[in-house]
A protein has these predicted regions:
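N-terminal Rossmann/SDR dinucleotide-binding element
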Residues: 1-56, 67
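Residues at the starts of beta-strands that form the adenosine-phosphate
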Residues: 11-13, 73-74, 138
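Conserved beta-strand scaffold positions in the cores of enzyme catalytic domains, especially
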Residues: 31, 75, 139-141
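NAD(P)-cofactor binding segment of oxidoreductase domains
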Residues: 47-108, 125-131
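Active-site Tyr-X1-5-Lys
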Residues: 105-141, 145, 156
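NAD(P)-dependent short-chain dehydrogenase/reductase
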Residues: 135-174
Length: 174
């Protein structure tokens, strides 16, 4: 991600603990070393800096989104599994599971009634995503696949990516 932004002419800063410096990151990249899981330390480390674009890929997303209000022109967050009804709580629906394909506007677990058997982890992800969009209405949120790439055990996304890369634009769905 860092090198892709550099290739496109961005001036890049990365915020991380500094515990695992990568030789793949060029020297021109500013490193902001702090604990991204501690909002007070992160706020102090950011100071009054502003950014045209902030890509949040780890740390406490809800807190980081709040810290970046007024500091980031555009927020892109990456993380979490789907927070839609039926994901993580398949037996709460009939037929069981999340509908496939699922629209981006489908019901979230946080929109279910109090008696709905919600998976708490999935509910927390949904609460976080809702907070991101409330704080940054033009934000984009990208969810990680299970594992990305041709070596994953359950090739759920890769089979579709491979078709796109091969120029096969049609996909038969049930």
């Amino acid at each position: 991600v860092v090198n892709g932004l550099l290739d496109r002419g961005f001036e890049v800063s990365i915020l991380h603990t500094g515990a695992h410096e990568s030789p793949e990151i060029p020297a021109q990249v500013e490193h902001i070393h702090t604990d991204p899981f501690d909002s007070e330390k992160t706020s102090e480390a950011l100071g009054s800096q502003t950014f045209d674009l902030a890509i949040v890929m780890y740390g406490r997303l809800r807190e980081l989104a709040n810290l970046l209000v007024g500091k980031a022109g555009k927020l892109v967050s990456v993380g979490g599994v789907p927070a839609y009804s039926g994901w993580g709580d398949a037996d709460a629906l009939w037929p069981p599971g999340m509908r496939v394909p699922t629209r981006e506007t489908a019901r979230l677990v946080i929109n279910e009634s109090k008696d709905f058997a919600v998976n708490r982890k999935v509910a927390n992800i949904a609460i976080t995503e809702a907070a991101v969009f409330e704080l940054h209405p033009s934000a984009s949120h990208i969810r990680y696949p299970w594992i990305y790439g041709p070596g994953q055990v359950a090739c759920t996304e890769w089979s579709i990516v491979r078709r796109i890369l091969d120029g096969r634009e049609q996909l038969i769905l049930p």
